[in-house]
Amino acid sequence: MRIGFLNPQGNFDPTDSHWTEHPDFGGQLVYVKEVGLALARLGIEVDILTRRIKDPDWPEFSEPVTHYDSERERLRIVRIPCGGDSFLAKEALWPHLREWVTGIMRFYDNRLPDFFTSHYADGGYAGVVLKQESSSGFTFTGHSLGAQKLDKLDMNPANSKSLDARFHFSRRIAAERLSMREASRIITSTGQERMEQYAHPLYASAVESGDDERFAVIPPGVNTRIFGAEPGPVDEAVTASLTERLPDLERPRIVISSRLDEKKNILGAVRAYCDSPVLRQRARLALYLRDVNDPFEQIKNLPPGERSVLEPILHLIDSSGARSYVDFVNATSQQVLAASYRFFAQRASVFVLSSLYEPFGLAPIEAGACGLAVVATRNGGPSEIFADGSGVLVDPANPAAIAEGIARALADQGDYAERIRQRVRSTYTWERTAESYLAVIEAGRRNTNTMRSNSIELDASVQLKRYLARRGE
């Protein structure tokens, strides 16, 4: 069997170039890569289909076909051109997706993969077009949905035109509605994601969130080849570097390792630490920043968006007198990240994820697999992951509650660390994720792929206008 992953945004290459450095190179790419590799290890032939880019600023993505060394025989990265040669952010891909699908069909000479799995709204729409053109079946994994984003941006009749021009919500919502309607199954990471996000009024009539036949809840996994208790190939070097650079080595660290995005609410966790004499006495703060060793000196090197998130964090650290209590860690790869987690785990440290909302929460599972105790937002996926008591759940909007949760985790660090390690082994591995995907795909292959939609045009402006009008009443 050959399975095609539809993921036009971002890109893939053997060295994971640009990951976490751009909004289109985040956790979704990790997810697609790891599920694809795990399926290949199960003996399935896998193609990760993305966009070909021939741009001097993005030289890694110019080859039409490449591979991951660990699974060269069964997994290909296939780059299909569309929309010209230059890199395009995901918001600019919408007019070119039909061209991309035409390129996919041309690449396979109409001998398409046996089944597709689509990712995000743009990949989902590609699945819809492929189904219309070839009767191919597909699953849809949304990762995040446009309705929640426009709500968070407080979209209303007054600002709808400008926000739609920037984020193309009318196209994205239409693509999501079509993907939900046409997919053989919708895959979510948690039950909460299914029941809350897919029940949004903008998806009414496209899918019923309570319909068990339309959904499969499949948790993501941890790359246990990298994130685990056993030392990796760079641990010795990372340990030497941290030992040389960091003060007060035996004190626990409160580890914050999230991309510089306002949604991650790093400021809330830093405020919890800075405002708590108890935490400052018991532990130091370790703040992870990619490609930056001293942000007070190097903040100008960061992109404007990241700089705007980091500036108030640095101001708070400085104004509260906590600068001498904070360490900055530059983790340049996943291997370095995991090695540093193991280093801090040996010092009874705690990982904190204080996102205002986290759709799933892979980062705390990775940290827990390396031996850190976990404090995580109660909003979103972590509420299910840690429902068994393997982590401490907190209200991310309340710095005092975050501080209290961190204090609890520090007090019982060994117990929490062991619980989350067991939780990872039993539930959150990519092998289990791939096995569940395969079961859903095999069931989908037995279904008839009849189109449910009369039109697949990307225009949800009527639904959007109606929703915003009701919301403003």
Residue ranges and their predicted role:
Residues 1-473:
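Catalytic cores of nucleotide-sugar-dependent glycosyltransferases that transfer UDP/GDP/TDP-activated
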